[in-house]
Amino acid sequence: MTALYWQTIGEGDRDLVLLHGWGLNAEVWSCMLERLTPHFRLHLVDLPGYGRSQGFAAMSLEQMAEIVLDAAPAQAWWLGWSLGGLVASQIALTQPQRVHGLITVASSPCFAAQDDWPGIRPEVLSGFQHQLSQDFQRTVERFLALQTLGTESARQDARLLKSVVLNQPMPSVEILNGGLEILRTADLRQSLAGLSLPLLRIYGYLDGLVPRKVAGLLDVSWPHSSSIIIAKAAHAPFISQPDEFAEIIGTFVAENGICRQNAQ
């Protein structure tokens, strides 16, 4: 049986869908709940094949976006972290009329490094795919450790991420490989350049997976969007700097919500 895990909580009147990253599940947002629920109606989703959304086969980015969108409210703000940022971006491209605004966190429209583009070396992503079949759990743990590297609370944050994975059903090797394949091959740089809805990109200064150079490059090629780099954060800024992160989200939605209402 395939069923998408979807939990809705919060006292606010604005819908905000939160999409997690590779290998994880919606529990990764636990530290943000008390900060966001007074202001938003939060939609916590386990992406297809991850956490409690079991029974799905590996799929393309477009297929994943379609499945998530089918369960979503008619209109919402969308926030995607890492791989979730690609899914949220694809949703904004597919059905922009259903997206009030898009927030990507430690994400890139093109995760794989290219000659003119900073990112993860393709052979590193391919290596992770190979290692999954050799030592599943250790490979996932290595990837999680990379996400917090360099922060003041790196060990504590890595333990939190590990507990998020272990406390819910584990994704299969097929699902994890499929996610890495999306990270290795997706390139939404040109597609998103034409997006006209509010777009905020949040980065961690210490992020070893999405280099901060990406922020400057997209500032130039996507002038309609804005970016913020959180100084002491790595790949999971909402875990290492939750108060600053929540303030950034609240400000962006408040400012752009007013702009959207005035434009309608």
Swiss-Prot record:
Pathway: Cofactor biosynthesis; biotin biosynthesis
Protein name, as recorded: Pimeloyl-[acyl-carrier protein] methyl ester esterase
Subunit details: Monomer.
HAMAP family assigned: Carboxylester
Cellular component annotations (GO), alphabetically ordered: cytoplasm
Top-rank lineage group of the source organism: Bacteria
Taxonomic source organism: Serratia proteamaculans (strain 568)
Active-site residues, record numbering mapped to chain: S82, D207, H235
Domain AB hydrolase-1: 16-240
A GO term, aspect molecular function: pimelyl-[acyl-carrier protein] methyl ester esterase activity
Transmembrane segments: none
Stated family: Belongs to the AB hydrolase superfamily. Carboxylesterase BioH family.
Subcellular location: Cytoplasm
